[in-house]
Amino acid sequence: MEKLRLLSLRYQEYVTRHPAATAQLETAVRGLSYLLAGRFSDSHELSELVYSASNLLVLLNDGILRKELRKKLPVSLSQQKLLTWLSVLECVEVFMEMGAAKVWGEVGRWLVIALIQLAKAVLRMLLLIWFKAGIQTSPPIVPLDRETQAQPLDGDHNPGSQEPSYVGKRSHRVVRTLQNSPSLHSRYWGAPQQREIRQKQQQEELSTPPTPLGLQETIAESLYIARPLLHLLSLGLWGQRSWTPWLLSGVVDMTSLSLLSDRKNLTRRERLELRRRTILLLYYLLRSPFYDRFSEAKILFLLQLLTDHIPGVGLVARPLMDYLPSWQKIYFYSWG
């Protein structure tokens, strides 16, 4: 136990001292997941495991950096724990589905899917009703912007002070003097004022409390939270080939969005979340049974047409054509 504690402390020290190298490690792990996909049998499961690990690594490192920078989430400790558990579930849900299907078959797969969706719904309802978290965004915890937030870790740069710079007489460009440039790993490749404005905007956005929801908005958010459970229940009643689950889920999503149509008083992050949900309605084109009966043939034909007539497109289109059928069958990819 003592060795594990020392190893943990050393890792935390490394992350706080080398945020740029940590970000490169996260990117390398995520890139490895893409390289593994389709290389051998069981490669999809291994690829998803590595991808889930990369997301958990980002979540862990962000927590370490926030603690070092004293940039705690603007929520209570209990709410922060719920958000963390919700984030962990979203990181591992696809791998858990694929692993359950591999080990326990279809029955185990659907059982794991139902348990994960139930756990996520309970956590989100607690956040909505008990903690008054408002419109819940995805991801639940905003990733830390390493480029701007990691600046205070550099001892030779103080973002709170005015940074000496030179203004060109003809071009009027603002150029940082070499003497006052931060070290390479924490340098921001933009005008000094741009970095300060960006930091201020992000800090204000993170510290802004969620918009209080009225009865109509609370019902809308509750519908959005309950939609996965309603869809799973309808699948159990009518089966995967029936149109009823697809139509019911679509009606619930559109009703939720229509009840949240008044966006004037929402924060920027909440408006972006509603825009994301609106765009995700396009996923219904890729969800069964609509995909099986209408979309699949047309999408594959279009990709093949682009591959045959536009040079270079095949490098992206062919792997996409190979992977799309597998992707569409994974519940948390298409319905999660």
Curated annotation (Swiss-Prot):
Keyword vocabulary terms for this entry: Membrane, Peroxisome, Peroxisome biogenesis, Transmembrane, Transmembrane helix
Stored InterPro entries: Pex16
Protein name as catalogued: Peroxisomal membrane protein PEX16
Membrane as UniProt keyword: yes
Topological domain spans for side Peroxisomal: 106-110
Intracellular or extracellular location(s): Peroxisome membrane
Source species: Mus musculus (Mouse)
Functional summary from the UniProt entry: Required for peroxisome membrane biogenesis. May play a role in early stages of peroxisome assembly. Can recruit other peroxisomal proteins, such as PEX3 and PMP34, to de novo peroxisomes derived from the endoplasmic reticulum (ER). May function as receptor for PEX3.
Gene Ontology CC annotation, any one: peroxisomal membrane
Gene name as annotated: Pex16
Residues exposed to the Cytoplasmic side: 1-84, 132-336
Pfam families, per database record: Pex16 (PF08610)
Biological processes, Gene Ontology terms: ER-dependent peroxisome localization; ER-dependent peroxisome organization; peroxisome membrane biogenesis; protein import into peroxisome matrix; protein import into peroxisome membrane; protein targeting to peroxisome; protein to membrane docking
Domain of life: Eukaryota
Membrane topology: Multi-pass membrane protein
Keyword Transmembrane: yes
Subunit structure: Interacts with PEX19.
Region (Interaction with PEX19): 221-336
Family: Belongs to the peroxin-16 family.
UniProt region (Required for peroxisomal location), positions on chain: 66-81
Transmembrane region(s): 85-105, 111-131
Coiled-coil ranges from the UniProt annotation: none
